Amino acid sequence: MLNLCHALRGVRQFSCSVIVKVKCASCSIKLQDQDPSKPGYYTKPKSLPDSKLNPDLQDLKYLLFSQDIQLSKQAIQNDPDLKTKRDLLLRVICKRCSNALHHNNYNPEEFPESTLNDILNYVPRGSNVMHIVPFVEFPLHLDPNVLKRNDLDTTLVLTKSDQVFKDKNAVSKKVPIFMKQFLKNTLRIDSNKTFAISALKNWNISMFYNYFKNYTYLLGNPNVGKSTLINTLLQKYLGYKVKIDSTGKINSPSEEVMQEAFTNPKNFFKIQAAGVSHIPNLTRSVQAYQVGGKILFDLPGYSTSTSRLRLEEPIDERWLQRLRKTDLFNRKHIKQKTYESMKGTSQGGCYTVGGIFYLVPPKGSINQIVKYIPGPSKTFKNIEKGIDVFNSCNSSSGTHPLSRYCGIKSVICEKSQYKRYAIPPFIGSIEIVLKDIGYILLRTTGRYEFKGLHEIWIPRGIQVGIREPLENLIESGYRRYIETNGKESSCPRDRPIISSLYEMAPDEADTLNAVKKSYLEKTEKDLSARRFVDDDPYDLVQHLXKKKNPYWYYQW
């Protein structure tokens, strides 16, 4: 405590008038200490152990120790000559963020979702926008409404590419060519403004920096990698937070704060960094950053569906953290592609990761599964058995022998809480993508013979889709493009490569005909997308080598 007093000697008293002008260092909301029910609230201690402490040290003790103990201790040790209150204020976070980040104690209702229109209120017409989409979950998160806007100059940025590709060669050269042709063929968007990057691996970050213009906005769903990208740029180009007033004047940190960039760069970055968290919707207000000679704006994430399920409801807290913390992703699966085998059974044998989904292969099929979702997998005799086991796990408070395989809460331990989806016919391999969760590769082996449709059961409200294996699709397409000197597209034109799934009634027996019926309904206003509508479904699936991906259709 004596060291703290010495370090903070001469610092003037904090006041409410100062605090309300300061933003939370994590979520960028304005701080206030008047109303606990309103955003930005931070609390002061009700009583102090030492009444002799003067008010300024009381406030400082609270702000530095009550909210962010580890960060503040290190900051004081590394910066014993701290002289200004401004750099102390930059460390302050609101009560909501403090509880969520340091105690993992948060109410999802305090992290409200925003719509695209809500977020666009921050963005002036004609602005430069980077639409941030995690490539690992492509095509989920890709919003054509953003790319097609005439009042914005939009570039598509595909993040987390290290979770799809082995090295950055494909990311640098092959992805932009593929995406240009995909956007043109699929969405009728003629654009060559696409970047694939990995902020964690520093792939293409220099190229990205050289490309983006001054006053650029980062726009995307929650947890797509916006803040991680910003922090990578801040470290690489010695960036920092700035404030821009109503006249457009840029207010940079004080000289004392900027001096720390040279005397203690590690601590300087901690103060300036964007708030990165596994908690969605953490960012609540726009935050500007000076990155080199350019201004970059971090926008709150927006959601495209009001009916979307909050993953906090069905999924266990520890499992959810593993799903969302992308730095924990194990890249050995990308290089080795270790698979698990499973044979379809007459009882409806299923494969699951934590109960988050149940994959049911058709009877007699031999399948290989490569899992890119954290957590141990498990097979069960049928879905009912899996749900029954996980129900017992939730009732046993962790003592059940299979508790390590359980990633769901008791609220989802009923079959009625899941939706049944049929996967349209395919031959070879596909990737099944679950929004905000990850993906698995599914491969059927042996001589092709149609044995039925694969099914997947997923909690209601979770979005799912399929795609042809992305890495192989882009690699083979690039080879074809180069070998023909660009005459052939790197993105296939003879078939769709992505598709939504088809919801089935729990008792539907003829899933193939039900899929065709649903396909015709979904494409009623998109007749140009229809294929094989005159073929009998059961004749069609006998010739998948020639008539690929029947009934594949993605609803944007």
Swiss-Prot record:
Similarity section: Belongs to the TRAFAC class YlqF/YawG GTPase family. GEP3 subfamily.
Keywords: Mitochondrion, Transit peptide
Functional note: Interacts genetically with prohibitins and thus may be involved in the mitochondrial lipid metabolism.
Domain CP-type G: residue ranges: 113-305
Organism: Saccharomyces cerevisiae (strain Zymaflore VL3) (Baker's yeast)
Chain segments annotated as transmembrane: none
Cross-referenced SUPFAM superfamilies: P-loop containing nucleoside triphosphate hydrolases
Transit peptide segment: 1-21
Entry GO CC: mitochondrion
Any one Gene Ontology molecular-function term assigned to this protein's record: GTP binding
UniProt cross-references to InterPro entries, sorted A to Z: G_CP_dom, GTP-bd, Mito_lipid_metab_GTPase, P-loop_NTPase
Compartments it resides in: Mitochondrion
Region forming the signal peptide: none
Gene encoding the protein: GEP3
Protein name from the UniProt record: Genetic interactor of prohibitins 3, mitochondrial
Major subcellular location class: mitochondrion
